Curated annotation (Swiss-Prot):
The keyword Amino-acid biosynthesis applies. GO terms for cellular component: cytosol. It is an enzyme of class 4 (lyase). It comes from Chlorobium chlorochromatii (strain CaD3). The active site is at 47 (proton acceptor), 58 (proton acceptor). One of its GO terms (molecular function) is tryptophan synthase activity. The gene is trpA. This is Tryptophan synthase alpha chain. Its EC number is 4.2.1.20. The alpha subunit is responsible for the aldol cleavage of indoleglycerol phosphate to indole and glyceraldehyde 3-phosphate. Keywords: Amino-acid biosynthesis, Aromatic amino acid biosynthesis, Lyase, Tryptophan biosynthesis. Belongs to the TrpA family.
Amino acid sequence: MAQNRITRLMQQQKKLLIAYYMPEFPVAGATLPVLEALQEHGADIIELGIPYSDPIGDGPVIQNAAHTAIRNGVTLRKVLELVRKARNGEGCKKITVPIVLMGYSNPLFAYGGDCFLADAIDSGVDGVLIPDFPPEEAIDYLDRAKNVGLSVIFLIAPVTSPERIEFIDSLSTDFSYCLAVNATTGTAKLSGHAGDAAVEEYLHRVRQHTKKKFVVGFGIRDKERVESMWKLADGAVVGTALLEQLAASTTPQECAERAGTFWQSLR
């Protein structure tokens, strides 16, 4: 079995800039050009959202993007098809950076757990993050994912106890994903700056109780915040701000241009 792209990336000593994108948002046909633009302008990992009709844990921007994606025909099967095309260079330059699928458990288990794992790895997916799947219930699923070569990522929040941080760190295959605040995605009230004492204390606590790398998401919008998070974590995830930049686009090409320009501004 070839080594997972995420595993290879985590062996490098670099700070990561990770993109979250909802497929086919805001227009059908945008996904492959956007992936190419993100890769070209320095995205280290690309997270693709799996749209769900009731995304209760997401902020309004991602909720709207999910509903738009559904209207544009996006299903889990469609997402896997797009990943396969991206890996093969069909409709864009070949995408070689790691791809993570992020979505709620209902669509994945409706697809069929083992079928999803097999089809995900076959299409070129490297990892999965299921926010509403408690780690305690994921042990068997985690073993099956590892057997096919998929990296599984779990969430840590500011209220997570030190003991639970260690438990989550032990389960996450390559890295954990830290929520920057106890809030829905993209609606953080905290600044996210390294100078924010609450954020610093939280991420120092995570560092003390983890052996693997961790990245931070939720509410990161610009280069200054990215660099602040790089001082405290191993990577920064930018999603809501990217979707906001794309929202007014009317063609796939315009989406790609906006994605590239915005992503370049974060580096």
